């Protein structure tokens, strides 16, 4: 018996010390859990809350908003049983660039150790993509679990690819026409067009920032992760390390065949304007565009078509053809160029992926730059005209349950509809990545006089009230040589509960 005892002890020690056996066991357990998990009842609490069943999660649920100027760069940290996992949502800046992008990417490297579970590119705008391009070599060293991109950029979709090419062609022509403008409105319109192209006027670069960013996202990361193209209503595939730790629902963009992407990038009735919406000129005067382009007085500023009369309406034999666009541009009055720039900007914004995460019972909504066409798809579930019929019960349920809201389009009035803000959970925390003034003290976009300033002051005030002062803006902190926005008014002297600031970012940690 004395000889058997040592054998038993040795066997135990060998079992504990063998890396092969220890590694094999967790793999089997993990595989078993993945097979069992989908058998949960859809209505069960664990399924709804996005909780990890069994074991102890490590880390805290946190959103980090990097301070890069007028653009989006968000890092969502998700606690899991194998430790914190990271989701990067957009990385770009355009107008209002405060030159902190490189430093922020280095902080991302330090925080994630070049490992990202998921990267999401919401839409094709430089202020959401340019950081990937300007830091291409750094990002090329990252290991990524999966990449999600709006399906409007899916190269296998012929219709989407054709429309993307048309937008690029129109943007290039607009860039040339607007390049000579020295007025503020013209320069802001030029900035919108360059945001769509990802390339500055007069540059010798053969590849724009947006295309370079797409190249990184689709094939440039170190481990060549799988890429998925999504639209609203689809059930996205989560990377393995996030399965069981969270759930995700895609609310936008509208399906490609719904027509709502082009139903209108604006709806002034749903905006935070001081006065009633302009009546403008009769709608029948405003139809020089093919049906893809919004063409009613609600979609364009009154001045955009001041030179038009019904009898002088432009007739196009083949709407949407390159020749038709050329003719339209040649005949365009200056304000029509501005309206076209707005249309390009709004159309790309409406292609934004709108992502609803649920983790540890908390709900987080990231809306990209979604404007009216995108919002109306899931707010109402049907085409809306005339009087507001009231948002759907499903939309009310989502908005009333939110614990975190990423303010749309940097605080623009055309991307945060009145009924959506009114339906927000009053205890919801909100972050707005924006820049109210560039280094010269000018606004990157819009004007207070025309009620188009970004961020829209009236909207920000309403968001403050609705969230009970749980709204924080990125331009409220100084970064590097850049001072806080004059609109900060000492807002960050005392941060709202669970917010904290670093040299380059603002964090929000969810209370347990």
Predicted segments, located by residue:
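Long, structured stretches of catalytic cores involved in phosphate-ester chemistry, encompassing
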Residues: 121, 130, 148, 367, ...
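Active-site metal-binding motif and surrounding structural segment of the metallo-beta-lactamase
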Residues: 79-87, 94-147, 393-412, 426-430
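Flexible, acidic/histidine-containing loops and adjacent segments that form or flank the divalent-metal
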Residues: 2-4, 8-9, 13, 20, ...
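Long, intrinsically disordered low-complexity tandem-repeat regions enriched in serine/threonine/proline
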Residues: 22-23, 29
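Short loop/turn segments at strand-loop or loop-helix junctions that form parts
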Residues: 68, 78-79, 90-92, 149-154, ...
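Short, solvent-exposed loop/turn and secondary-structure capping segments
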Residues: 74-76, 86-89, 99-101, 130-133, ...
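Conserved beta-strand hairpin/beta-sheet module of binuclear metal-dependent hydrolase folds
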Residues: 55-114, 173, 348-376, 430
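Short, flexible/disordered intra-domain loops and linkers
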Residues: 96-99, 158-166, 439-454
